[in-house]
Design a protein with these regions (language model features):
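C-terminal beta-strand-rich structural cap/linker in extracellular carbohydrate-active enzymes
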Residues: 11-37
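Short, charged low-complexity linker/loop segments at the C-terminal edge of domains
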Residues: 28-42, 118-127, 324-332
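Extracellular and organelle-lumenal recognition/adhesion modules and their flexible linkers in secreted
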Residues: 143-341
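Carbohydrate-interacting/catalytic domains
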Residues: 1-7
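Amphipathic, heptad-repeat alpha-helical segments
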Residues: 38-95, 123-148
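Inward-facing hydrophobic residues that define packing positions of alpha-helical scaffold repeats
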Residues: 82, 89, 96, 101, ...
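Short alpha-helix capping/helix-loop boundary micro-motifs
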Residues: 7-12, 232-233
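Long beta-sheet-rich domains in secretory-pathway and surface-associated proteins
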Residues: 36, 54-58, 87, 102-110, ...
Length: 341
């Protein structure tokens, strides 16, 4: 291996470090010999299995890219990577015929590495315009990226007239808006956390929603349980139908009244997908806009939940619910899991 002697030690650069690679540092060279013997013993099987995996992954990725290109231009570098993968697979097949299992394994690993890079490029391209990957339900897997772009194309076609799809909004202009609009509050046991949800002044005559939680024991001697959510505030119900698309927009920031050790103390999620697909942004004292795009699969009622995960103060404002009604049979909007594998 290339070695670079530096002050305090030795720097070694390892090329093509794969996910299954191993580094052994030992003064007993017999260990290396035993390891090499084990590798030779499984080399035939390892080469065959890795070759099969590379072939299957190439077919799956190629198929997904083909579907994606019907909805959106593939990112730069896609064609080059696919060409490199094909070249590696051709070399791998040739090495299998000659019985060079070690080289066959290296070519398979090279193909898999380029396929992972291609998947990452497509995912990065898909999430570039979102406030978070969690904003769209179809960015959680490479196989559903075609569904993501189909969803984005449908939303983009309505962007210019999104105001016409506004179903409900909350600007928290007065102290009674929470109760009047029908927000629901759920808090942890008072022996664990003290909490508040109220509307407070925010300069220039405006008001914002404040959510805050802090330990009930001011001395800090009581243990704070990680499995307890201090505060959850749930929005009023918005009626929906399967095939609709709900877009929730708003802005959020960190307050200063309660110190928090977490950079992401707030979880925003919806009743269609649940907290597992929630949005956790790193909050600062500056306002950050958020947007959740949710295709409705089977729900009839849709709500936004704002969950304070630890001691913190956060502010929420300008919450808007937009509803794009279900597409036609000619332009359907697919739900989670309807394409890909």
């Amino acid at each position: 291996l290339p070695r670079d002697v530096r002050a305090g030690g030795l720097a070694i650069r390892i090329r093509d470090f794969d996910r299954c690679a191993a580094i052994v540092v030992t003064s007993d060279t017999s260990i290396i010999q035993k390891l090499e013997q084990r590798i030779r013993g499984i080399s035939v099987r390892a080469a065959a299995v890795t070759a099969e995996l590379a072939e299957l992954k190439h077919e799956r990725v190629r198929e997904t890219v083909s579907q994606l290109q019907r909805e959106h231009a593939a990112p730069s570098g896609t064609a080059t990577l696919l060409t490199a993968v094909k070249s590696s697979l051709n070399k791998m097949r040739q090495e299998q015929k000659t019985g060079d299992h070690s080289e066959s394994l290296l070519q398979s690993a090279d193909a898999l590495r380029n396929l992972r890079h291609l998947q990452f490029l497509c995912w990065k391209d898909a999430t570039a315009g979102l406030c978070s990957p969690a904003a769209s339900p179809h960015t959680t897997a490479f196989a559903t990226l075609p569904d993501h772009w189909r969803l984005m194309n449908r939303v983009q076609s309505e962007r210019s007239q999104l105001a016409n799809h506004l179903r409900w909004s909350a600007t928290f202009d007065d102290a009674g808006s929470l109760q009047r609009d029908g927000w629901e509050r759920a808090a942890a046991d008072k022996t664990l956390f003290s909490t508040t949800t109220d509307v407070i002044p925010a300069g220039a005559g405006g008001r914002v929603l404040r959510l805050a939680a802090w330990p009930a024991d001011p001395t800090g001697r009581s243990a704070v349980r990680d499995d307890v959510v201090p505060l959850v505030l749930t929005s009023p119900v918005v009626a929906v139908s399967p095939g609709d698309i709900v877009i929730v927009r708003g802005r959020v920031r960190r307050g200063s009244a309660v110190a928090s050790g977490s950079r992401s103390p707030l979880l925003l999620y919806d009743t269609e997908l649940g907290p597992e697909h929630g949005l956790k942004q790193e909050l600062t004292s500056d306002w950050q806009e958020f947007e959740l795009i949710r295709p409705i699969h089977r729900g009839r009622e849709f709500q936004l939940c704002a969950s304070v995960l630890t001691q913190a103060e956060v502010h929420l404002d300008d919450v808007q619910f937009h509803l794009i009604e279900a597409g036609t049979s000619e332009t359907p909007v697919r739900m989670i899991g309807t394409s890909g594998r």
